[in-house]
UniProtKB/Swiss-Prot annotation:
Similarity section: Belongs to the LpxK family.
Reaction(s) catalysed (UniProt annotation): a lipid A disaccharide + ATP = a lipid IVA + ADP + H(+)
Membrane-crossing residue ranges in chain numbering: none
EC number of this enzyme: 2.7.1.130
Recorded superkingdom: Bacteria
Protein name, per record: Tetraacyldisaccharide 4'-kinase
Binding site for ATP: 55-62
Classification via HAMAP family: LpxK
Gene (name only): lpxK
GO BP term, example: lipopolysaccharide core region biosynthetic process
Top EC class of this enzyme: transferase
Keyword annotations of the record: ATP-binding, Kinase, Lipid A biosynthesis, Lipid biosynthesis, Lipid metabolism, Nucleotide-binding, Transferase
């Protein structure tokens, strides 16, 4: 229902307009206060890059963060990552992730980013505290990438990158809750780069698509072409589950059943195993896999995806960030 409201298919969005105007008024006032320096943002001693979005829901932001961190690491840059840690329940904040940190403590995306990149990752509702925690333990870090947080103006930033879902784009264009917008589309004029996940990019936007890798068994780490798996049940607890199901079909997999879950939904063995029989093969997203490794069965697999950016702009962006991190 919420997708139909936000896309404009359902007329119910009109009933929510008063709340949307209030949301827009408050969020605009907050940004204006920081712009006019009525409120002061904290500036880190190293450059900060924000990877965020203008809309609620999944846009492919986390794969972009992983791509950015890995690309900078390949250029010899030491990167730290901070996140709010949505859904996390740590005993105290900031929390610096370790190999033993669970998704319940830190949230799904921070654990995924930590496991994929081996970069220092810290979570805190106050992102400046997360930055301080990383720099205290890793003083050699040269640049901070913040996963989400475009609207978290308490943290000063040097570069802003926005990720857009190229198919859904901005829906009906209204602020939450009548539409999907955290900020209006005009905000794109002030950011440094716009990355479009799928769809048809517009002038000045960087095209991106998610490239699936080999399926990985949660228990053994065995890898294989996902099309070799039989009697597949697909499960996705991400912002937009249909994107994952479409990716599987693109890989030649016709799932016997698709199980969409809420983004950041907590998972346990009983709930997951109820979705798949012993004769079937469960294929989930990597984001779900980080929550299921501790209790995985032998017929559970996940399909990792990597962000692939096209054109000349990604190289220019990386050159800019490398120079920034190097102090040039």
């Amino acid at each position: 229902m919420i997708e139909k409201i936000w896309s404009g298919e359902s007329p119910l969005w009109r009933l929510l307009l008063p709340l949307s105007w209030l949301y827009g008024l408050v969020s605009g006032a907050i940004r204006l206060c920081y712009k006019l320096k009525l409120k002061r943002a904290w500036r880190a001693p190293v450059p900060v890059v924000v990877v965020g979005n203008l809309t609620a829901g999944g846009n492919g932001k986390t794969p972009v963060v992983v791509w950015l961190v890995e690309q900078l690491q390949q250029r010899g840059i030491r990167v730290g990552v901070v996140s709010r840690g949505y859904g996390s329940k740590a005993e105290s904040y900031p929390l610096l992730l370790s190999a033993d940190t669970t998704t319940a403590q830190a949230g799904d995306e921070p654990v995924l980013i930590y496991q994929r990149t081996d970069a220092p990752v810290a979570v805190s509702p106050v992102r400046s505290d997360a930055v301080k925690a990383i720099l205290a333990q890793h003083p050699d870090v040269q640049i901070i990438v913040t996963d989400d947080g475009l609207q978290h103006y308490r943290l000063a930033r040097d570069v802003e990158i926005v990720v857009i879902d190229g198919v859904r784009r901005f829906g009906n264009g209204w602020w939450l809750p009548a539409g999907p917008m955290r900020e209006r589309a005009g905000r794109l004029k002030s950011v440094d780069a716009v990355i479009v996940n799928g769809g048809v990019p517009r002038s000045g936007e960087i095209p991106m698509h998610l490239l699936p890798g080999q399926a990985v068994n949660l228990r053994t780490g065995t890898r294989c072409d996902v099309a070799q798996l039989e009697h597949v049940v697909a499960m996705a607890g991400i912002g937009h589950p249909p994107r994952f199901f479409a990716t599987l079909k693109m890989c030649g997999v016709q799932p016997e059943k698709c199980v969409p879950l809420a983004d950041h939904q907590s998972l346990n063995h009983a709930d997951v195993s109820a979705s798949v029989s012993a004769e079937q093969t469960l294929v989930m997203t990597e984001k779900d896999a980080v929550k299921c490794r501790a209790f995985a069965e032998e017929n559970w697999w996940y399909l990792p995806v990597d962000a692939q950016l096209s054109g000349d702009e990604p190289a220019k962006l990386l050159t800019q960030l490398t120079s920034l991190a190097s102090g040039n």
